[in-house]
């Protein structure tokens, strides 16, 4: 069975994680109203304000997302001694799962981004802020706060919005601390010089940031991979996760690995803060022990949710769990194919060096004998294809009273099993045509057969494959189960 933890298990584990986040906090202010006329003073719309609200932005939005997922957070940032800074302090105070260590610089203007909306249409954004590195005293105080918390967390996030908190030696010192503690260090970068993040576990640039940092095009999959590899080689980071809007995400590792994840959003209303959601979900999942590729899948799902909402939204754990369940349903349904589609899928697997296994049957009423055979078959290969007799095929083999369940129901049940990677329905009496098309590396049947009597064994053996006769689980068969349901008795020798 696949040892990768289920996404649902990872989402459930997020309530037990604690993440340390350091970066540029800001106040995101949203002004909403209606546009009914154009100003007589200039060709601009007049917004009649209906609503105004403020929320944590920048690194603060990363914190909001970690908490929304159920996690806890230690948060280090710097604000000004002003009204916006006081608002940020109040908003952080409302987050009971956040331990805040916020420095105050009297001469600093807290970053405020004010967005004006008419309906769902953004009209204007106005920024009010100071962009300057921390003075040595504030930098040392911030690093001291990090030292006091870093042994109590499962991941470290650097959320760099280019406002100065992570300038100078601060970022390098933080990354060194994280790696000393064997923590995953996730950096949301800013600017053209990614060498400042040397030693990070994951960089998460968007497409534009990646292009600016490398001077390379980032329009296609191959171009993105090339740019990511340049960052890895030049900057000494372990991996780069490039976020690509409608084209999804691409994860590239220093080991040469590449993973493309398609975009999950059905409708996009607002991309504000989507990168923060990716970083937060990635960090929380890694803090919970998820493998990097799995954490990226979860982050991709979360991003698909958040861009469907207006404003810098956070994704609650319940919404992410619902998306996970929907993905599992879609993945299950995509496992059910015809012979031609099966060949395309198998060819793709082969190009990745995977060993293909094959077994077949009617699988009318699934029982422990079926499960045992499928488990043994999956253990002998990397991907298991199950050939499923169509309804017409079953009737010819078993009689007009069979199958009990139609082929759609039987295929759905099989596709729901973790040991089954693909279900291919065939209409012939035997799977010989399907076996000849797919040319599996391992052909599996029950031990009540001999190698010579297994349909397709000659094809597989001639092609360099092997035949596996799986141990049978005594006392289980579909035919005897049906007989008992009708008041009959179990018949010895009943088969699948």
UniProtKB/Swiss-Prot annotation:
Active site per UniProt:
276
Q: Which residues bind ATP?
A: 206-209
User: Is this entry keyworded Nucleotidyltransferase?
Assistant: yes
Is the keyword ATP-binding assigned to this protein? Answer: yes
Could you tell me which Gene3D superfamilies the record lists for this protein?
A: 3.40.1190.20, HUPs
Which residue ranges run through the membrane? Answer: none
> What's its EC?
2.7.1.167, 2.7.7.70
Pathway(s) of this molecule: Nucleotide-sugar biosynthesis; ADP-L-glycero-beta-D-manno-heptose biosynthesis; ADP-L-glycero-beta-D-manno-heptose from D-glycero-beta-D-manno-heptose 7-phosphate: step 1/4; Nucleotide-sugar biosynthesis; ADP-L-glycero-beta-D-manno-heptose biosynthesis; ADP-L-glycero-beta-D-manno-heptose from D-glycero-beta-D-manno-heptose 7-phosphate: step 3/4
The broad enzyme category this protein falls into is transferase
Q: Which GO terms describe its molecular function?
A: ATP binding; heptose 7-phosphate kinase activity; heptose-1-phosphate adenylyltransferase activity; phosphotransferase activity, alcohol group as acceptor
GO CC terms: cytosol
Q: Which GO terms describe its biological process?
A: ADP-L-glycero-beta-D-manno-heptose biosynthetic process
InterPro entries the UniProt entry points to: Bifunc_HldE, Cyt_trans-like, PfkB_dom, RfaE_dom_I, RfaE_dom_II, Ribokinase-like, Rossmann-like_a/b/a_fold
Keywords assigned by UniProt?
ATP-binding, Carbohydrate metabolism, Kinase, Multifunctional enzyme, Nucleotide-binding, Nucleotidyltransferase, Transferase
Q: Which Pfam families match?
A: CTP_transf_like (PF01467), PfkB (PF00294)
Q: What segment(s) does the record annotate as region Ribokinase?
A: 1-331
- Reaction catalysed by this enzyme: D-glycero-beta-D-manno-heptose 7-phosphate + ATP = D-glycero-beta-D-manno-heptose 1,7-bisphosphate + ADP + H(+); D-glycero-beta-D-manno-heptose 1-phosphate + ATP + H(+) = ADP-D-glycero-beta-D-manno-heptose + diphosphate
- Chain spans, region Cytidylyltransferase: 358-496
How does this polypeptide assemble, per the annotation?
Homodimer.
Q: Known PANTHER family for this protein?
A: BIFUNCTIONAL PROTEIN HLDE
Q: Which family does it belong to?
A: In the N-terminal section; belongs to the carbohydrate kinase PfkB family.
Q: What does this protein do?
A: Catalyzes the ADP transfer from ATP to D-glycero-beta-D-manno-heptose 1-phosphate, yielding ADP-D-glycero-beta-D-manno-heptose.
Put simply, this protein is called Bifunctional protein HldE
What is the native source organism of this protein?
Answer: Rhodospirillum rubrum (strain ATCC 11170 / ATH 1.1.1 / DSM 467 / LMG 4362 / NCIMB 8255 / S1)
């Amino acid at each position: 069975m696949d040892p990768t933890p289920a996404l649902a298990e990872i989402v459930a584990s997020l309530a037990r994680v604690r993440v340390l986040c350091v970066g540029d906090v800001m106040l995101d202010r949203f002004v909403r109203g209606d546009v009914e006329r154009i100003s007589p003073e200039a060709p601009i719309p007049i917004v009649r304000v209906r609503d105004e609200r403020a929320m944590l932005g920048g690194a603060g939005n990363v914190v909001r997302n970690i908490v929304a997922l159920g996690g806890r957070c230690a948060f280090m940032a710097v604000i000004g001694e002003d009204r916006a800074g006081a608002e940020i302090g109040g908003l952080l105070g409302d987050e009971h799962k956040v331990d805040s260590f916020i420095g105050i610089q009297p001469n600093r203007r807290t970053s405020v981004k004010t967005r004006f909306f008419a309906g769902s249409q953004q009209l204007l954004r106005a920024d009010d802020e100071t962009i300057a590195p921390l003075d040595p005293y504030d930098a040392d105080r911030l690093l001291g706060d990090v030292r006091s918390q870093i042994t109590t967390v499962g991941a470290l996030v650097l959320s760099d919005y280019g406002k100065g908190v992570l300038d100078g030696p601060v970022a390098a010192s933080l990354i060194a601390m994280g790696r000393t503690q064997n923590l995953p260090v996730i950096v949301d970068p800013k600017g053209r010089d990614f060498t400042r993040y040397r030693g990070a576990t994951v960089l998460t640039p968007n497409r534009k940031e990646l292009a600016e940092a490398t001077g390379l095009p980032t329009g296609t999959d191959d171009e993105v991979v090339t740019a990511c590899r340049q960052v890895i080689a030049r900057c000494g980071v372990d991996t780069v996760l490039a976020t690509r809007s409608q084209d999804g995400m691409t994860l590239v590792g220093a080991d040469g690995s590449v993973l493309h994840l398609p975009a999950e959003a059905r409708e996009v209303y607002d991309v504000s803060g989507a990168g923060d959601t990716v970083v937060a979900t990635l960090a929380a999942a890694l803090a919970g022990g998820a493998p990097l590729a799995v954490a990226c899948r979860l982050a991709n799902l979360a991003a698909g949710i958040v861009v469907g909402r207006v404003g810098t939204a956070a994704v609650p754990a319940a919404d992410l769990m619902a998306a996970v369940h929907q993905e599992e349903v879609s993945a299950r349904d995509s496992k059910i194919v015809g012979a031609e589609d099966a060949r395309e899928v198998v060819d793709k697997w082969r190009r990745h060096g995977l060993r293909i296994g094959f077994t077949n049957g009617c699988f009318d009423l699934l029982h422990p004998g079926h499960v045992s055979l499928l488990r043994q078959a999956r253990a002998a290969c990397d991907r298991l294809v199950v050939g499923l007799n169509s309804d017409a095929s079953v009737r010819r083999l078993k009689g007009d009273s069979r199958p009990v369940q139609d082929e759609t129901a039987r295929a759905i049940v099989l596709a729901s099993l973790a040991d089954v990677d693909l279900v291919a329905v065939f209409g012939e009496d035997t799977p010989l045509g399907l076996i000849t098309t797919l040319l599996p590396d391992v052909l599996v049947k029950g031990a009540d057969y001999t190698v010579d009597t297994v349909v397709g064994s000659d094809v597989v053996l001639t092609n360099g494959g092997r035949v596996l006769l799986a141990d049978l689980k005594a006392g289980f068969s579909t035919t005897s189960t049906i007989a008992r349901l009708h008041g009959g008795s179990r018949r010895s020798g009943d088969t699948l």
